[in-house]
């Protein structure tokens, strides 16, 4: 699947009731939110496969679910320290942090080496990254 196809698919799967439910759990990102459930994102990964360049585009999309999807299709061994920093600095909800750590950063030697550094940061979601990686 190409980037534009993925975005169209996410828009098609939009679920406003899920967005309301997410808000009740404190998921109120500044990015656009479609309310696509994680199991639907996992189904999409089967068609996309691993694609690091696409993953970076998805992280940069400004769409909540696309960013989570990016964490699922990225290749941990190709992550640079600069890419990790760029991703971490854009975190705006706990679920994106947790999913990115579980799906991607946990498999990255570079990200794991930054745990102590992340734990000393002031920004809530940057600090959470450290604790999600330790869990």
Name each region found by the language model:
Residues 1-135:
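Alpha-helical scaffold domains
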């Amino acid at each position: 699947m190409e980037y534009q196809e993925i975005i169209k698919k996410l828009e098609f799967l939009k679920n406003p009731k899920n967005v309301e439910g997410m808000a009740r759990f404190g998921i109120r990102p500044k990015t656009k939110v479609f309310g696509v459930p994680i199991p639907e994102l996992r189904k999409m990964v089967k068609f996309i496969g691993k694609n690091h360049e696409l993953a970076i585009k998805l992280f940069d999309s400004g769409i909540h679910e696309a960013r989570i999807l990016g964490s699922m299709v990225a290749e941990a061994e190709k992550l640079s320290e600069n890419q990790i920093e760029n991703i971490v600095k854009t975190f705006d909800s706990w679920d994106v942090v947790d999913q990115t750590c579980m799906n991607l950063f946990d498999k990255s030697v570079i990200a794991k080496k930054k745990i102590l550094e992340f734990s000393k940061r002031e920004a809530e979601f940057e600090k959470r990254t450290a604790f999600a990686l330790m869990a």
